[in-house]
Regions:
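Conserved protein kinase catalytic core
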Residues: 46, 85, 114
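Binuclear metal-ion centers of metallo-dependent hydrolases, dominated by the metallo-beta-lactamase
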Residues: 1-5, 88-145
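Conserved acidic residues
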Residues: 74-77, 102
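Catalytic metal-binding/acid-base residues of hydrolase active sites
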Residues: 42, 79-83, 108-110
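A short, acidic, amphipathic alpha-helical segment used as a generic capping/interface helix at domain edges
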Residues: 61-66, 85-94
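Active-site glycine- and acidic-residue-rich loops that bind
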Residues: 19, 83-86
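Core dinuclear metal-dependent hydrolase active-site scaffold
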Residues: 1-72, 135-145
Length: 145
């Protein structure tokens, strides 16, 4: 799929959104469950980027995420890339604040599992549960409220 396309396969609806790097991001809806996977859609605020490029990265990330406003997202997989150093949390914070998924699952953190603990400690709420991942192969159970 390319950006901004929709596909329906029996009871599964897939909508594609843009990325700020490679590929696309996806919203999958089935059986009254909605799952968003950001892929490489991230707020890439690299220290080596000048201010103009950093502002563009912010604008492009927010533009794609804002397309999800008004949609109920049950589960969201969003990058929290520690290579961005002190800016690693920006994409996740914006997504949680603006979209308010029921469950937020951090991705793109390699083996830096402390990042997931940081997110849980900082952003877990009655509105959005944040998954803390302790190691590879961990299972996360989602139940509706």
């Amino acid at each position: 799929m390319e950006k901004d396309e929709e596909l329906k396969l029996e009871n599964v609806e897939i909508s594609s959104y843009g990325s700020t790097d490679k590929g696309v991001s996806f919203l999958v809806e089935l059986d009254n469950l909605s799952i968003f996977h950001a892929g490489d859609l991230n707020w890439w605020k690299w220290k080596k980027f000048n201010e103009k490029v950093q502002k563009r990265e912010e604008r492009e990330y927010k533009r794609e995420v804002d397309k999800l406003m008004g949609k109920q997202i049950d589960i969201a997989f969003v990058p929290v890339d520690p290579r961005l150093e002190e800016h690693f949390y920006l994409a996740g914070e914006y997504f949680i604040t603006e979209i308010r998924p029921a469950l937020f699952v951090p991705i793109h953190f390699a083996d830096n599992y402390d990042v997931t603990r940081f997110f849980k400690d900082r952003f877990n709420s009655n509105q959005t549960r944040v998954a803390e991942i302790a190691g590879p192969g961990e299972k996360i159970l989602y139940t509706r409220k």
